[in-house]
A protein has these predicted regions:
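N-terminal pre-triad scaffold of radical SAM enzymes
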Residues: 39-43, 61, 248-274, 298, ...
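A short beta-strand-loop structural module common to alpha/beta enzyme folds
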Residues: 66-78
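N-terminal [4Fe-4S]-dependent radical SAM core
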Residues: 8-38, 45-46, 203, 209, ...
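Radical SAM enzyme core and accessory elements
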Residues: 1-27, 31-33, 37-39, 483-611
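Glycine-rich beta-alpha loop elements in corrinoid/cobalamin-binding modules
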Residues: 75-222, 459-507, 515-529
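Canonical Radical SAM [4Fe-4S] cluster-binding loop centered on the CxxxCxxC motif
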Residues: 51, 252-288, 594-611
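Flexible glycine/acidic-rich beta-alpha junction loops that bind and position SAM and/or redox cofactors
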Residues: 77-78, 153, 207-211, 317-318, ...
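Conserved SAM/AdoMet-binding glycine-rich loop
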Residues: 39-40, 44, 113, 296-403, ...
């Protein structure tokens, strides 16, 4: 097989995607290995190697005695064509062995439009798609990642899901499999025992029944199966595993840098944001541990860039202390330090000036809505004065590029709100004219609008999505009010976001749709080069599924939702209260101004929420 791979590589784009052999990859002697895990990322090497969760769990599993975790990525179209032409099955990078030879096949799924890749990769591996068709302990397929907070569209294909943060649960799962394999358990025995691990959901243990109108009538748990599956979290991040010897990619990837996670969770509560609610409660790392991790990562990788990551990095309490240590270290070694996920209401002039020593790039902010009324509806907790004041400080400090991200189709949005985006952008331009210290290069304002997708476990999970036609009308309305040459405006095509909404709030009836779409040729749907909406519309029609049922239909507040058994810590009572506050244009202050009672702190047993 290795010889065949070597013959194919010169015929495809970016062959280094498929070779392995990178610096810091993990190799093990098969004589010392009891459990082999194929860790699959359902997208290309460039995307998967940038994924922090994959780097963490790759390290976690390879720290285990007798376990070898290897990486698998979705092939690009030219490689898939070559594989099919030569009868070459999907393989893992480290050993170049076929995925079907592995004990366990794990997926991390962070984007609904990767569902077709999951099935496509199983097909390429020669592994039966349906969980019921895979007998015995060989090729146990499980999945984690944020999409598993509504796992139902993939329920037919995945043996079990692991909800939440996986550093501890993955060790428990793989250790149980090691025991099951040694004792020659049946698959049913293993699934029964793995379902007892907190955070594990076995979909075959649950029956879904529907009303005549298509809504969900009841979810029946089989005897012994938990009725509620509560996500796992890591309480003490200072003592949690961290991958300081990260693999150095052998080809360019999307985020080719050391990635330092400063804290988990979010204090804000933007009502559209799934991560902001599903990743609660807030837990931080100490600046001392972060600084030590940073030095080890940079030393072990030779990287010339490091980023401080989180959902809102400027909300990290220890940011000043950490940057005071890191910036001199990076400056002396010509290492670039980036601090993304900044908010316009707490991005200080002092931090701006310090960052100039190690990075000078464009500023990026996400006001999300153009008017204060709509920003209050979505609980952005950000005023126009704060946006303009921050931009003015940045322009005075020498910045000449700014990116502004907005959404169209948010609940209660009107044309006045849409045009408010244009008004805000022109005020940013005026702020540049009044404050810029270097006007020779001119100003570039990049404006982007996304199509609102209602997501599970948010206050807007019940909302309807506007039609694609209405979304495009609002895009064109906004574009017609951009006259300045300083403005670049991009908007997302609606088809992908509409399909994302179908999958995000979908149920088990979408399994046949995904399977049919893959038969039609769907794969790499997150890439413009490959996404073809006709693959999906044909599949929806064939399976008799109306996409509007999941998109433009508002869900009832008393309706049973497919993801209701998945407990992310935030209560439905809180989400409903936030939804009603949205319609009253009432803001809920961030967690540092007082606990709003979301419920996520109940997940903590040993530490307190750091909000």
């Amino acid at each position: 097989m290795t010889d065949l791979i070597q013959r194919i590589l010169p015929t495809v784009q970016k062959p280094a995607r498929y070779t392995g052999g990178e610096f810091n990859e993990v190799k093990k002697d098969l004589n010392d290995v009891r459990v082999r895990v194929a860790f699959c990322f359902p997208d290309t090497y460039e995307i998967g190697m940038s994924n922090l969760g994959m780097r963490i769990l790759y390290g976690v599993m390879n720290e285990m005695d007798g376990v070898w975790c290897e990486r698998v990525f979705a092939p690009w179209g030219d490689m898939q064509q070559a594989m099919e032409q030569h009868g070459l099955p999907l393989w893992a990078l480290e050993s170049q062995h076929p995925v079907k030879d592995f004990d366990m096949v794990a997926f991390t799924i962070g984007y609904e439009m990767a569902y077709s890749n999951v099935l496509n990769m199983l097909n390429l591996a020669g592994i039966p798609l349906h969980a019921k068709d895979r007998q015995g302990l060989k090729n146990i397929v499980f999945a984690g990642g944020v999409c598993t907070f509504n796992p139902e569209p993939l329920a037919d294909f995945i043996d079990f899901f692991s909800l939440g943060e996986g550093e501890e649960s993955t060790v428990e799962i793989v250790s149980l499999y090691d025991k099951a394999k040694a004792e020659d358990w049946t698959k049913d025995q293993f699934l029964l025992e793995v379902s007892k691990i907190p955070g594990v959901y076995v979909p075959s243990f649950y029956e879904h029944r529907y009303n005549e109108d298509g809504t969900l009538a009841e979810i029946i748990a089989k005897e012994g199966a938990p009725k509620v599956i509560t996500k796992r979290i890591i309480e003490d991040l200072d003592n949690a595993y961290w991958p300081t010897k990260m693999i150095v990619p052998s080809t360019e990837i999307v985020h080719d840098r050391a990635n330092l996670e400063v804290f988990r969770g979010c204090i804000r509560g933007c009502r559209f944001c799934q991560a902001g609610f599903s990743c609660r409660p807030v837990r931080k790392k100490s600046p001392e541990v972060l600084y030590r991790n940073a030095i080890e990562m940079l030393t072990n990788s030779g990287s010339n860039e490091i980023t401080l990551s989180s959902l809102s990095t400027s909300d990290y309490r220890g940011l000043k202390e950490l940057t005071d240590e890191l910036i001199p270290y990076c400056a002396e070694r010509h290492i670039s330090l980036s601090v993304p996920s900044l908010r316009a209401d707490n991005f200080s002039r002092e931090l701006m000036e310090k960052l100039q020593a190690v990075r000078k790039s464009g500023l990026t902010f996400a006001p999300e809505a153009g008017t204060q009324r709509l920003r209050d509806v979505i609980n952005k907790n950000l005023t126009e004065d704060e946006i303009l004041s921050t931009c003015a400080q940045a322009f005075a400090g020498g910045w000449n590029n700014v990116k502004l991200y907005f959404m169209l189709g948010l609940p209660t949005e009107t044309d006045e709100d849409v045009l408010g985006i244009a008004e805000l952008v022109y005020k940013v331009i005026l702020a540049w004219k009044a404050n810029a210290t270097n006007k020779k290069r001119g100003l570039r304002v990049h404006v982007a609008t996304a199509y609102f997708v209602p997501k599970p476990h948010t206050p807007f999970q019940w909302e309807q999505q506007i039609t694609p036609e209405e979304y495009l009308r609002r895009c064109k309305l906004l574009k017609s009010h951009f006259y300045s040459k300083s403005i670049e405006y991009d908007y997302h095509a609606p088809d992908l976001s509409r399909l994302e909404a179908v999958m995000a709030r979908g149920d088990r009836r979408l399994g046949p749709v995904i399977e049919e779409a893959v038969k039609n040729g769907a794969r790499l749907d997150g890439w413009n080069e490959y996404f073809n909406i006709s693959h999906w519309f044909d599949a929806l029609n064939t399976c008799g599924i109306d996409p509007d049922f999941y998109t433009t239909r508002g869900f009832g507040e008393d309706e049973l939702l497919a993801w209701d058994p998945m407990d992310v810590g935030v209560t439905k009572k809180f989400l409903l209260r936030e939804r009603r506050r949205a319609y009253e244009s009432q803001v809920t202050p961030d967690c540092r101004h007082g606990c709003a009672g979301c419920g996520a702190n109940c997940l903590l047993k040993e530490v307190e929420c750091d909000a």
